[in-house]
Each structure stands twice: as C-alpha cells, then as structure tokens.
Amino acid sequence: MASPNPYSYSPQLPQREESPYQEDQYQSSPSFRSTPFRSSRGTGAGTGIGLGLSSGFTSSLRGGAGGPSEPRSGDGSHDDLPQRSSSSSTVIPSLPPKPKPSSIPETLWSLQIPLHITHQSHPKTPYICSVPRFSYLALLLPRLTAYYGTPCSSFHHEEVHLRNFAVGLLVDLYQPSELPWRLTVADGMEWDICDTFMNSAKEADFIRNGNAKRIMGLSKEHTTALWNAVQDNDYQAFTKINTHLLNAPTALKNVPIRIYIPSSPSPPSSDQQQPQRPGGSSSSGSYRVMQTLVPPRGPNNRTPQTLGQALKSLLPALFPSSRDPVLASVILHGAPVPFSAPLEELMRDASYPDGWLCLIVVLL
C-alpha cells in the first residue's frame, strides 16, 4: 500500500454548530482528542501549565501533572469498583485505568493543552479543544476554517502574531495567566507546517552530526511516517524513526539547543536583536533567541557537559554559577531544569519532535 502524502493530509472537517460553546468533535483523532484538563501553575514557573515543581526535572515530568486527568486506581477508594445506576439494579462496569507513561518522552507526548479559540468576526462563538503539547496550531486551521465559514490562517495572543512553534513552546514563551489558553484566529500570514517541521529537523540533524545525512537518507516512506507521527501524536511510531536519527555511527558533535531570553519592551537597537520575535506592537512575549554550537562534553572531553556549565559559558551575566540558579532559571516543558542535568541526556529525553532543546530563561 502506498504511503500517505503529508502534503495531502486533510482531516475530516466538522460541521459548524450554533452552540456558543463548541466542543471538539474529534474524539477518534489521537492528535486533537477533547480531554479533561487541569491547571497546575507552579510558583516561579509561570508557564500556564505545569509538570509539577519538584526537586528534579525527571521527577517533575514523571509526575504527569498538566496532562489529562486519569482514573484513580488502588488508592483505597471504591472508584475502581462497578457502579450501580440509581434508577435500576443494572451494574455499570467502570472503565479500566489508563496506563501511565513509563518514560519522560512518553510523558511529554501525553501532555495536553486546553485552548479557547475565537475568530475576530465571531468573538462570542469559541472553539474549545485540547491539543497535544508537541502539536502545532496550524493543524487546527482546516477545522477552524470550516467552523467559522471564513479563511483562517494565523493565530494571535494578545495581538501578538504567533509563530509556527510547537504549542508547548508557545505556552512556555507567552505564559498565559489562565487555562484554557485564549487565542484569536484570523486570516493572515501562513506557513506550510510540514516544511517548517522538516527544515527544523534537518537543521537539528546537521548540528548533531556535522551533516544531515541521517535524515536526508530516510526513505520517502519513513520521512512521511515521521511527519504523520507528529500529526497523529503517535509516540511509538515517532520513536521508531527518531531512534535512527539520534544514534548515528559517529560521536555526537553538538546538542541542538535554542535559548529564549526575555528582552526589554523598548524597541531593539538593531534589526538583528530580535530576529524571531513573533510580531505585533505588544511587549508581551518579547524575546531574543540564542542559538550556537554546544558540545555534549566538557573542555577536557572526558566528562559530560551539564546544563549549568553550558549556561554559564553562554550567558555568564545571567548565570554566574554553573551549579545553582542565582539570577535566572530555565524552563523546559513547563518545568524547571536542574543545572546538573547532562545536555546529551536532556537532548535524548526532552527535545521537541524536531530535535531541538528549547529553554526559556526566567528571571528570578
């Protein structure tokens, strides 16, 4: 059977309803399943969603907070027993407990972010859904266009035009004060999200190996499967291909890392100061991006380089200590990252699907 073409992917579009609160009807789609959600804003995180603030990044992620609510099991209550209907003696069996993710990457792929989307011409007709943290807003555009009956191609947060970043990265950057995250959709600049993702993945592959032979050597079938796995939020399918990309026959040269630094709301002094700012006149979410080559091992090439060592080397004014956050900390997937974390381990366990570690600087 021929592989699906990622450029021709077009999910079934919903019919517009007049209800003021339209729940996402795509229960069968693993990419945009409408699920319960809970907010867990942690002190100091300021990310709008939380993975739980604990003593370490690993335990924060394994906590799973910020994702869909899961049935309780074995907690001493009777929630796992069959329930009887109040109107009859019929026994209604309860659903089996949902298995918990067994690894950090699997936990990250399971996290969902609730959205409340309105159109400029329909401010009182929201489209409410919950999307995976690793998904992209652009994948919602066909549904929103059909729902509002008008072309939709861009998203805005407080008048700031959002870039085509993963949803989780956008949440960490703009730190919404409450959930669901309220966005506005309109007609405007648009990107081919498949091209955007693949170009970013190729750049990450080049940084890791000094060339992009690993990803360029993928067959058309595997390249299509990689993008389809992101669209479908299919961790298992993604891992089969990503494992090949991460395990090159040569040693890892550099870790693909981008550091997002909050900048002053005043106008930049040069055109190069904010090359990747989303746009708009609002100072909300104003930032600059640092991207440079960061080796996975220290200067002596004997010990793994830690996050703290890299931050002190790249931004000594913000990170004078390589052991503890003094003036600033960094957020990754809604959780603070310990400075002792080895960069290569972070790359393998906590990179976005395109291969990049995206760290958000938070001033203390």
From Swiss-Prot:
One of its GO terms (biological process) is piecemeal microautophagy of the nucleus. Residues 1-13 have a biased composition (Polar residues). Residues 43-53 have a biased composition (Gly residues). Gene3D superfamilies: 3.10.20.620, Autophagy protein Apg5, helix rich domain, Phosphatidylinositol 3-kinase Catalytic Subunit, Chain A, domain 1. InterPro entries: Atg5, ATG5_HBR, Atg5_HR, ATG5_UblA, Atg5_UblA_dom_sf, ATG5_UblB. GO terms for cellular component: Atg12-Atg5-Atg16 complex; autophagosome; phagophore; phagophore assembly site membrane. It is a peripheral membrane protein. It is found in: Preautophagosomal structure membrane. There is a cross-link at K202 (Glycyl lysine isopeptide (Lys-Gly) (interchain with G-Cter in ATG12)). The keyword Membrane applies. Transmembrane segments: none annotated. Residues 1-103, 262-306 are annotated as: Disordered. The keyword S-adenosyl-L-methionine does not apply. It comes from the Eukaryota. Residues 28-42, 269-286 have a biased composition (Low complexity). Residues 72-82 have a biased composition (Basic and acidic residues). Keywords: Autophagy, Isopeptide bond, Membrane, Protein transport, Transport, Ubl conjugation. Conjugated to atg12; which is essential for autophagy. Involved in cytoplasm to vacuole transport (Cvt) and autophagic vesicle formation. Autophagy is essential for maintenance of amino acid levels and protein synthesis under nitrogen starvation. Required for selective autophagic degradation of the nucleus (nucleophagy). Also required for mitophagy, which eliminates defective or superfluous mitochondria in order to fulfill cellular energy requirements and prevent excess ROS production. Belongs to the ATG5 family. Conjugated with atg12. This is Autophagy-related protein 5.
